Amino acid sequence: MLKYKGLEGKNVLVVGLAKSGYEAAKLLHHLGANVTVNDGGDLSKDPHAKDLEKMGLKVIGGHHPLSLLDSNPIIVKNPGIPYSVPLISEAEKRGLRILTEVELSYLISEAPIIAVTGTNGKTTVTSLIGDMFDKSRQTGLLSGNIGYVASKVAQEAKPEDYLITELSSFQLLGIEQYRPHIAIITNIYSAHLDYHGTLEEYRNAKRRIYKNQTEDDFLICNYNQRHLIETDGLKSKVYYFSTSQEVDGIYVKDGYIMLNGLRLIHKDDIVLPGEHNLENILAAVLAAVLGGVSIDAVIATLTSFSGIKHRLQYIGSNKTNKYYNDSKATNTLATQFALNSFNQPIIWLCGGLDRGNGFDELIPYMKNVRVMITFGETQDKLTKLGESQGKYVIRATDVKDAVDKVQNVIEPNDVVLLSPACASWDQYNTFEERGDIFIESFRAHLPSK
């Protein structure tokens, strides 16, 4: 870790404790800053707050007093806290510096960074790159929005390692010098407008990922959205990925992934399903190769990586039937992607919390659905949907019962897909719990060895 001197003796206000705030506060203290931690919640029993107080840090919970700004501190803000919060908006009015802890990760580490942002696909791309580094026996450390605090991981990184960091638009708003060696924008669609205000502001936040790049750096973008990249002042080398066009970068031709004219692998030999995941794969392969990963390691990942848990996750086969866990599909858009990912007949397990919405937008994606098994509060709605499209529909009490009922109707080469299109809270505490039960139920039907 670099002994960064730029914060020594400076007043720093960490707003929002949580995991990233806790790690940022400890790091700032280590760097010699005068640290105050503030959180709107009750911290009287919070173990992290107590730990920071033992270190001599000032911790204030329960409210955000504006008097905390009187010392003109640098603010390190939890990315989830909106700029509309009075303390933050007042800090903006006063012209105070407002950072997120991901900026700290850059300031303290010499390790090059592969940074991934986008509306969809961030976690999958980040995880794919990490797996490719692992299989190449190079050190690639996952961090950021994927669940590992960037500033904590950066402290462990050696100069020869890579930091592979997933970044949200919230995190990117709070950077100043942050400069990834390789930046990826998977795609940009309308999202988080309650936070950013307008689509253009959201896009501008995403574009910050490449603003500090130099001629020695690389930017990887979706060719279909190349018009969203502002080229004025852009210094980095731009490469594209495309599933339909030959581009300067990586693309698909005659079913094969092509990199600089080199044929890597046929898409049918890739384990991770779905056309949307093919775009994620292209971006990850290009970034990994630019980072020094061998082609052999890339191929090893593509022929083994089955996805992020609960996100169109391949969980195994029973005879000729493959099972996929897409429990994280808590809305119809996610289920559209899932249903569109297979050419084989599908036994579709669906249902969950009723939020009052309909499901007609799924109809164009149901052509390969052979059987529907419905459960949860939306069971009646989804049953009617299936029957209206001439599908064979079975009612189940829950996910376990649905998997049990699969065994009565399954035929050779059917794909069994849990993609609920609904939140889990009517029957399960989390989508993870729902997905885990699906996996357990599948395993219970495997032949005994």
From Swiss-Prot:
Origin superkingdom: Bacteria
Name the EC number(s): 6.3.2.9
Primary location group: cytoplasm
Q: In which pathway does it act?
A: Cell wall biogenesis; peptidoglycan biosynthesis
Keywords of this entry: ATP-binding, Cell cycle, Cell division, Cell shape, Cell wall biogenesis/degradation, Cytoplasm, Ligase, Nucleotide-binding, Peptidoglycan synthesis
Q: Catalysed reaction(s)?
A: UDP-N-acetyl-alpha-D-muramoyl-L-alanine + D-glutamate + ATP = UDP-N-acetyl-alpha-D-muramoyl-L-alanyl-D-glutamate + ADP + phosphate + H(+)
One GO-annotated biological process of the protein: peptidoglycan biosynthetic process
Family, similarity comment:
Belongs to the MurCDEF family.
Give the protein's function: Cell wall formation. Catalyzes the addition of glutamate to the nucleotide precursor UDP-N-acetylmuramoyl-L-alanine (UMA).
Protein name, entry field: UDP-N-acetylmuramoylalanine--D-glutamate ligase
Source organism per UniProt: Staphylococcus carnosus (strain TM300)
